[in-house]
Amino acid sequence: MATTNNKNLTITEKVYVRVRLANEADISHIYKLFYQIHEYHNYTHLYKATESSLCDLLFKANPNPLFYGPSVLLLEVSPTPFENTKKDEKFKPVLKTFDLRATVEDKEAEEFKSKSCGDEKEDVFIAGYAFFYANYSCFYDKAGIYFESLYFRESYRKLGMGSLLFGTVASIAANNGFASVEGIVAVWNKKSYDFYVNMGVEIFDEFRYGKLVGDALQKYADKEKA
């Protein structure tokens, strides 16, 4: 059951979910979701992307085979079933129904209304994303998947959807011959830490994450090219 009022969405009892591969029509939503995760971590001052630069990164300038270049899966929700979902030629969408223990109040529904349903449904809204790409390590003889980030808008957290989205990425890795799924886990976020452990992720405490960026990186630039 669902109601809409002043661009807000209220869902009770059941919510229908679809995980699909993002495309160029989704770029404005991806940009907003990426900004929101920077807000969550208090890193908005580091967010340099634009819709145009993201579109180039994810689609126009991405010549890599499927899932080897920067890839985004979107998790969409609807108060009504996805009955006539068209199959993406690259990736078969994953469908699931969630029984709600509490009412979902989405005050951003209109802003995140899906523009790329492919099945003429008007009541589809983007709830979250997974961003990942291939990585390589001398520990393995084939590529792995680097899981860059998983994010849900506040209205759709703690509903079990994270397990579906991360599990879909893990399934992609297992079914396409990747060696691993790897990423960074924030040790300060116990809920996130416990989530990944419960999903089967092994945490290596003896390693620390390092980054060379900004002015520190530019010190290595070829001065003759300046």
UniProtKB/Swiss-Prot annotation:
Residues 72-222 form the N-acetyltransferase domain. Keywords: Acyltransferase, Cytoplasm, Transferase. It is an enzyme of class 2 (transferase). It comes from the Eukaryota. One of its GO terms (molecular function) is tyramine N-feruloyltransferase activity. GO terms for cellular component: cytoplasm. Its main location: cytoplasm. InterPro entries: Acyl_CoA_acyltransferase, Diverse_Substrate_AcTransf, GNAT_dom. The record marks R157, G160, G162 as: Important for catalytic activity. Residues 29-45 are annotated as: Important in binding site and for catalytic activity. PROSITE patterns: GNAT (PS51186). Its EC number is 2.3.1.110. Inhibited by (2-hydroxyphenyl)amino sulfinyl acetic acid 1,1-dimethylethyl ester, by DEPC and by N-ethylmaleimide. It holds the Pfam family Acetyltransf_1. It is found in: Cytoplasm. It catalyses: tyramine + (E)-feruloyl-CoA = N-[(E)-feruloyl]tyramine + CoA + H(+). Coiled coil: none annotated. Signal peptide: none annotated. Homodimer. Belongs to the acetyltransferase family. Synthesizes amides which are involved in stress response in the cell wall. Catalyzes the synthesis of hydroxycinnamic acid amides from hydroxycinnamoyl-CoA thioesters and various hydroxyphenylethylamines such as 4-coumaroyl-CoA and sinapoyl-CoA. This is Tyramine N-feruloyltransferase 4/11. It comes from Nicotiana tabacum. The lineage of its organism: Eukaryota, Viridiplantae, Streptophyta, Embryophyta, Tracheophyta. The gene is THT4.
